[in-house]
């Protein structure tokens, strides 16, 4: 069926690794958590935009390593997904990050929710995949440290902001 409608427009792609490989969505949820955390800390739109951009760079690097086409990742399933996921309070991962940024514990957030923030469960796997493929994903690795290894959220954010300048 045709999913184009008055309020929604799709595009045509026939590239499995970039569209359905799960790489873009799995990576976008980590960027969303980080963006939510800086939102919860009141750090502003510029910081969130920087994290979103770094998250997109990670999606592209991992996608290319898995033979996805960069142009697919620059479409709706890449940029479209990460833009929505990193900016909308109805995004489960963004709202989880906001709650963490406001000082709530992961355990209390998870107990109070009826929906799943998939980033909580995929972070370690994506971090391991990136390591296995020798793909730099510092944002994803940092979110993994916060969610699964008890890293301090303020130190994690500071570490991301203090990373050496590089071409991204």
Regions found by a protein language model. Give the residues of each.
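Short linear motifs in low-complexity or flexible loops
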Residues: 5, 17-20, 25
């Amino acid at each position: 069926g045709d999913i184009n409608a008055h309020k929604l427009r799709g595009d045509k792609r026939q590239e499995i690794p970039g569209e359905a490989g799960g790489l873009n969505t799995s990576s976008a949820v980590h960027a969303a958590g980080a963006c939510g955390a800086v939102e919860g800390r009141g750090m502003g739109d510029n910081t969130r935009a920087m994290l979103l951009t770094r998250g997109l760079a990670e999606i592209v690097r991992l996608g290319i390593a898995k033979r996805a086409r960069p142009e697919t990742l620059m479409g709706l399933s890449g940029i479209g997904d990460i833009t929505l996921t990193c900016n909308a309070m109805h995004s489960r991962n963004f709202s989880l990050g906001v709650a963490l940024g406001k000082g709530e514990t992961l355990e209390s957030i998870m107990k109070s929710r009826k929906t799943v923030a998939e980033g909580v469960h995929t972070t370690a796997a994506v971090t391991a995949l990136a390591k296995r493929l020798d793909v730099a994903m510092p944002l994803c690795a940092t979110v993994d440290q916060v969610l699964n290894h008890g890293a301090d959220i303020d130190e994690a954010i500071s570490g991301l902001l203090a990373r050496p300048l590089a071409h991204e």
